[in-house]
Amino acid sequence: GVKKVIVSAPIDDPKILNLVYGVNHHLYNKDEHNIITAASCTTNCIAPIVKVIHDNLKINHGSITTIHNITNSQTIIDKPSSDLRRSRASMTNLIPTTTGSAKAINLIYPELKGKLNGHAIRVPVINASLTDCVFEVKQNTSKEEVNELLKEASKNKLKNILEVTHEKLVSIDFNHHPASAIVDASLTNVVGSNMGKISAWYDNEWGFSNRMCDIAETLHKIS
């Protein structure tokens, strides 16, 4: 029978390990974890950024907005539904909705529980999304330091998972990109000295699929 199951969606169960490759996959225990979740595409985009910022600057609070392309859970034309916004035509509207990504981050970083929240805006784009992260941090910082911390991580512990670009690109340029998050360094901003904004692009299908493969390979090697 099946010995290991990797779920490609969030699971709201504290007994199930929320595993984001490159961030906390070292927590996997072959004798304990037979079912794990790879969280979601957006969680995989946010988690590496949270790791870098929290490890180096300590996050006090944060708000996350994902500007997300449409998915097959939406409708082409308006239709009756209990979810009034998701029932509207997906290709002609910007649609505010919920995201479980911030909640999943809290499972990965319990010390941030109640300190991060967010929502999604579904936009009429076929593929590639953008996550906007705003953090209040304990340590004073600057735009240059934030970008340097992210760049350093992208070359070391988070190589091939987190990337940084200085190019003036748009969403379609990240179609079929294998990284979980590609930070747009030109959009990084710091206000005051401890309020920062980081924007990261991601292919919510292909990037996430690559991490699923990374997880499967890791489980195979360990098991």
Describe the predicted segments one by one:
Residues 39-40, 94-96, 202:
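Hydrophobic alpha-helical scaffolding
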Residues 50, 147-150, 216:
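A generic alpha-helix structural signal
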Residues 44, 140-141, 206-207:
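A generic structural signal for alpha-helix starts
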Residues 175-223:
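NAD(P)-dependent Rossmann-like dehydrogenase/reductase catalytic/cofactor-binding core
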Residues 58-61, 66-196:
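C-terminal substrate-binding/catalytic lobe of Rossmann-fold NAD(P)-dependent oxidoreductases
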